[in-house]
Design a protein with these regions (language model features):
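Long, charge-dense low-complexity segments
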Residues: 1-174
Length: 174
């Protein structure tokens, strides 16, 4: 449902510094886990710890969308406050904080699907029993004008098309 090669989004080699830090942290965690497992394999009682997966296409897509959104907000005069790997972000616009979540749209699994958690390298960031819908969702956690805003990607409306509306709403909320 998504185009991993969408040219309107930031490339993985040119991500926003906050998003680039997430990728670097993930790689560093993978390397330290490999080193720890090598060390444990030499121990008599040593069992290995769970392997940390590579970033999936869905992870890379979410990172590219997030990076593009960050750059657009900064271009409009906003700032990026706190930005967590889970997708929780704080934007600072005109000295006003706006909390937002950029995450995978999840749906309840009606039956157990083999390999259902393989869509992300971060399965511990999501509730069990939920699976990816294949679309991203951007939600304001801060109420603006008495309501919360929500944008959900669909097969007809890709996130690259929705991003200008999101940027406008964030800047207008400040």
């Amino acid at each position: 449902p998504f185009d991993e090669n969408d040219e309107s989004l930031d490339h993985m080699r040119a991500l926003h510094p906050k998003v680039k830090a997430w990728v670097a942290e993930h790689r560093q965690l993978q390397e330290s886990r490999r080193a720890e497992n090598r060390q444990r394999s030499r121990d008599f009682w040593g069992g290995s710890l769970r392997h940390i997966s590579d970033l999936t296409a869905r992870d890379r897509y979410r990172f590219r969308v997030t990076s593009t959104l960050f750059r657009a907000i900064e271009k409009q005069g906003g700032q990026i406050g706190e930005a967590k790997l889970t997708g929780k972000v704080t934007f600072l616009v005109s000295d006003q904080e706006l909390k937002c979540v950029i995450a995978e749209k999840m749906s309840r699994a009606t039956k157990i699907i083999e390999g259902a958690g393989k869509w992300t390298a971060f399965p511990h960031h999501h509730q069990t029993g939920l699976v990816s819908s294949g679309f991203l969702r951007v939600r304001f956690d801060t109420y603006v004008n008495g309501r919360s805003r929500d944008w959900i990607e669909t097969s007809k409306k890709k996130m690259a098309i929705i991003l200008p509306d999101i940027v406008s709403a964030i800047i207008a909320a400040g």
